[in-house]
Amino acid sequence: LLMSRRPVPVTLAWLVALIIPVPFIGVFSYALVGEVRLGRWRVEAYQRLTQGYAQKATVFWRGGNHDWTDECAEYRSIANVATIVGDMPPLRGNSLAVLADAEHMIEALIRDIDNARSRIHMLYYIWMPTGAGVQIVEALERAAARGVTCRVLVDGVGSKDFIRSDLPERLRKAGVKFAEALPVNPVRMLFARIDVRNHRKIAVIDGWIAYTGSQNITDSSFGYRPLVRVGPWIDASIRIEGPAAQALEVVFLRDWEIESDERLGD
């Protein structure tokens, strides 16, 4: 704890609240959830891929007419921050549409999947094996039958019901490449935290259309629990059309290469 270079308030909170008053419970709790441990090989792979994709992104950015900061100098500072944090520069020439509920997002996504010509990449934290989840699977099956390359990555905990269903096998039989992010198994529990999950919600079609936001592949009734007076989640997504979709595709490809055996190269 003292050697982990955590912020001083965080270190003091662990010491004062748990470790000093109840040493055994405190040490056990810290070992369980105190450190963000993803496994050394995973961290090293992520760093290596991040560096590689960042270099390719720089070449892409400099090779095209993407730098708009000379025209909007007041945004140059925040653009630099975004580039450092996200490993991709802000890109101009995009059309954005807000999809304020699950129905509109799922309908638009299925329509774009049905119109896909080359590739579809999807990464979601929660993918339910019912309703909208089945509809998206059916759309991916149609796309794969047309010769579109499809890759699907879901979180091992958030999408556990989907993973245990027959839908992943349906996708594989249709020719869709499927992988599980941060899979849970007894060996991994010894060396990495299983509560650290991949919460991303990304879909990219043909490298030009992308979806992101808070909406998972679920119906609008997801999370509705009337007995405890909890209503359904109200999520929103953004549909992006333009070069910014490629930045989201880089995020997907980086995660995909870590979780699958496929090396995509360029």
Range-by-range predicted roles:
Residues 1-266:
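N-terminal localization/anchoring segments of enzymes in phospholipid and broader phosphate metabolism
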